[in-house]
Amino acid sequence: MRMSEYFRILQGLPDGPFTRKQAEAVAAQYRNVFIEDDQGTHFRLVVRQDGTLIWRSWNFEDCAGYWMNRYIRDFGILK
């Protein structure tokens, strides 16, 4: 196998607010990360485990990406 087959480079979120494009890229990598409460200009990125809410952040919050990255690291299930 090639080295690239052993390692996957995953896209994370910036520490602060994040864009829809960034959220979609992250959610596409995980089976349990979703965009919810979509209001058009703002939305929540959510981590769930067996349907139970683990963490959620509005995309415009100051430290939204920082906390989402931590919970995704600990609870995210790669596709």
UniProtKB/Swiss-Prot annotation:
Name listed for the protein in its UniProt record: UPF0401 protein YubL
Keywords attached to this entry: Plasmid
Gene expressing this chain: yubL
Transmembrane segments: none
Gene3D superfamilies (alphabetical): ykff protein like domains
Keyword Transmembrane helix attached: no
Pfam families assigned: DUF905
Family according to the record: Belongs to the UPF0401 family.
